[in-house]
């Protein structure tokens, strides 16, 4: 049966990519993304001059969440490999030169398309242009992904905390949709802190997509907990994540014990201040920062802030 095939396939690392891709092709539902069903529908002309050694990919779908946030999906180059949680340098031709910025890949490694979640900066060198993209437009991407928010950079544990603010949720959007995350951890907690309630919607959309996915929904089950908080509006869960960690409210709300380096692992992505403060709290709890070449109890992405 297809379910048996899937369960069997992802035992081997390459196998479940194939099974998930096949399922993704069959089950992909684009109704909420206002996008066409096929990549082939676009025969967009490539820009006249594309820099050497970069990919030129076609935008497939764009969804604007607020006046500050949007997500988009684009074609994935044949042969482009990455680990869930990594980032890529993406860009646009502005005038006659390319402008690039680091963006976490929000889609999981098995997805046949690439997804990104972006802030809109009115005078940003790249985002002032990127926020105007439409299906059929061309986005550039450098060929080598990288990043520290990968499962390989953590030592084995029981529970994985993903601490995010703003667009810092993007690498975790990739990881919470990757079966390997649930092979390695019994529990996964995604915290997402924003200023306003409307900015949390991407996280809620991700939860719904996982629940509705034929295979991921069954595999994830109740292993994944979502903890959204806001700092500027009334909401059931309010406050900076570091304040909620320090007071213990985070753990009380989740029904979990405080951080324990024997079982808990962490990943952090967000604003500069949030990275610094969350790192300090994890270290105070006895967790040690790791890296790709030296796995430990938690990792931080410092390549950009969101």
Go through the PLM ranges and name each one.
Residues 5-9:
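Short hydrophobic alpha-helical segments enriched in small aliphatic residues
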Residues 35-44, 49-55, 191, 196-306:
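Reductase modules of NAD(P)H-dependent flavoproteins
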């Amino acid at each position: 049966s297809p379910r048996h095939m899937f369960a069997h396939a992802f035992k081997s690392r390459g196998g479940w990519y194939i099974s998930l891709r096949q399922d993704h092709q069959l089950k992909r539902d684009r109704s909420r993304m206002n996008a066409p069903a096929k990549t082939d529908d676009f025969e967009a002309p490539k820009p006249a001059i594309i820099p050497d050694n970069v990919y030129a990919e076609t935008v497939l779908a764009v969804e604007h969440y607020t006046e500050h946030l949007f997500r988009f999906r684009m074609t994935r180059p044949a042969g482009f490999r990455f680990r869930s949680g990594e980032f890529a340098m993406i860009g646009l031709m502005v005038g006659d030169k390319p402008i690039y910025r680091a963006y976490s890949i929000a889609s999981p490694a098995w997805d046949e398309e690439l997804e990104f979640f972006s802030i809109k900066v009115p005078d940003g060198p790249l985002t002032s242009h990127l926020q105007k993209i439409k299906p059929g437009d061309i986005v550039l991407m450098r060929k080598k992904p990288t990043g520290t928010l990968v499962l390989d950079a953590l030592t084995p544990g029981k529970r994985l905390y993903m601490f995010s603010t703003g667009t810092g949720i993007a690498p975790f959007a990739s990881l919470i949709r990757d079966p390997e995350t649930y092979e390695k951890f019994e529990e996964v907690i995604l915290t997402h802190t924003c200023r306003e309630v409307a900015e949390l919607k991407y996280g809620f959309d991700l939860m719904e997509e996982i629940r509705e996915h034929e295979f991921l929904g069954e595999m994830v089950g109740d292993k994944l907990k979502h903890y959204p908080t806001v700092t500027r509006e009334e909401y059931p869960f309010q406050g900076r994540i570091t304040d909620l960690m320090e007071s213990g409210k985070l753990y009380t709300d989740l029904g979990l014990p405080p951080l324990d380096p024997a079982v808990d692992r962490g990943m952090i992505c967000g604003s500069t201040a949030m990275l610094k403060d969350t790192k300090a709290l994890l270290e105070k709890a006895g967790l040690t920062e790791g890296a790709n070449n030296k796995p430990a109890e938690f990792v931080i992405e410092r390549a950009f802030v969101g």
